[in-house]
């Protein structure tokens, strides 16, 4: 699909202070309502890794059949790393590579899962929210660790969950996706409701801690082996 990274940081002077200000402004554009088809055809998962001692950002994209959760396409995009890691500003470091990976997909996904925060973020604008606002695609953030808010530890069974609260408002879910594993931090990014983010993540879980879209993207981004593609994709 076609996309452009040119307008992503238009007007940003490169400073941390202005990046945080832009997050606060762009967070006003986030839509926390379900705008995903009841029967989507395609899902996508995205994750980022680094090469050359951090000098190159490596973004992985996996397109999946929404019904079978089998992978249809995998792509990797590489761009020079333009910013050091700053907590809470992950999208300013990784978004250009993610958008480059999105552009490699032959078809547009109906829903995107990103390894990172949605609105479960100090300024309610993590990388999944930023990605969604920039692309217009429904998005969900699935993170391995909490960045903001507090929660009561969910029960120990698969599917147990509890709300994550920040200043009295819910910003996400702590989800026990697999027994004896730490909970995932799940939150809507854009064009998905709070409940929708939880429901879609549960629908895409299999035998692993991570939902299939980000599990496969994580495997590709970290170069932990090849991904076998579905040889006869479902007719769309």
Swiss-Prot record:
- NCBIfam families membership: PRK11617.1
Q: Which GO terms describe its cellular component?
A: cytoplasm
Q: What class of enzyme is it?
A: hydrolase
Q: Is the Nucleus keyword given for this protein? A: no
| Cofactor(s) demanded | Mg(2+)
Output the superkingdom of the source species. Answer: Bacteria
Question: Protein name, please?
Answer: Endonuclease V
Site (described: Interaction with target DNA):
85
Encoding gene per record:
nfi
The UniProt entry's sequence similarity note says:
Belongs to the endonuclease V family.
Q: Where does Mg(2+) bind?
A: 47, 115
Catalyzed reactions = Endonucleolytic cleavage at apurinic or apyrimidinic sites to products with a 5'-phosphate
Q: Which GO terms describe its molecular function?
A: deoxyribonuclease V activity; magnesium ion binding; RNA endonuclease activity, producing 5'-phosphomonoesters; single-stranded RNA binding
Q: Where in the cell is it found?
A: Cytoplasm
Per the entry, what this protein does is: DNA repair enzyme involved in the repair of deaminated bases. Selectively cleaves double-stranded DNA at the second phosphodiester bond 3' to a deoxyinosine leaving behind the intact lesion on the nicked DNA.
EC numbers, comma separated: 3.1.21.7
GO BP term, example: DNA repair
InterPro entries for the chain: Endonuclease-V
Q: Which UniProt keywords apply?
A: Cytoplasm, DNA damage, DNA repair, Endonuclease, Hydrolase, Magnesium, Metal-binding, Nuclease
Identify the HAMAP family for this entry. Endonuclease_5 (MF_00801)
Natural source organism = Xanthomonas campestris pv. campestris (strain B100)
**A Pfam family that the UniProt record links to this protein:** Endonuclease_5
């Amino acid at each position: 699909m076609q996309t452009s990274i040119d307008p992503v940081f238009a007007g940003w002077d490169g400073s941390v202070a202005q990046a945080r200000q832009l997050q606060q402004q762009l967070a006003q554009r986030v839509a926390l309502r379900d705008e995903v088809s009841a029967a989507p055809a395609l899902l996508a998962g995205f994750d980022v890794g680094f090469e050359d001692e951090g000098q190159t950002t490596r973004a992985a994209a996996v397109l999946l059949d929404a019904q079978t959760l089998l992978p249809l396409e995998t792509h990797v995009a590489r761009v020079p790393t333009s910013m050091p890691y700053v907590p809470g500003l992950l999208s300013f470091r990784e978004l250009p590579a993610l958008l480059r990976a999105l552009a490699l997909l032959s078809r547009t996904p109906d829903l995107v899962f990103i390894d990172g925060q949605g609105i479960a973020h100090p300024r309610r604008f993590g990388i999944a929210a930023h990605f969604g606002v920039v692309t217009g695609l429904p998005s969900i953030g699935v993170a391995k660790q909490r960045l903001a808010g507090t929660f009561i530890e969910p029960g120990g069974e698969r599917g147990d969950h509890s709300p994550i609260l920040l200043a009295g408002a819910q910003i996400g879910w702590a989800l026990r996706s697999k027994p004896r594993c730490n909970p995932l931090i799940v939150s809507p990014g854009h064009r998905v409701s709070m409940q929708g983010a939880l429901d879609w993540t549960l629908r895409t879980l299999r035998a692993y801690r991570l939902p299939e879209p980000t599990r496969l993207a994580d495997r590709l981004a970290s170069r932990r082996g090849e991904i076998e593609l579905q040889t006869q994709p479902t007719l769309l």
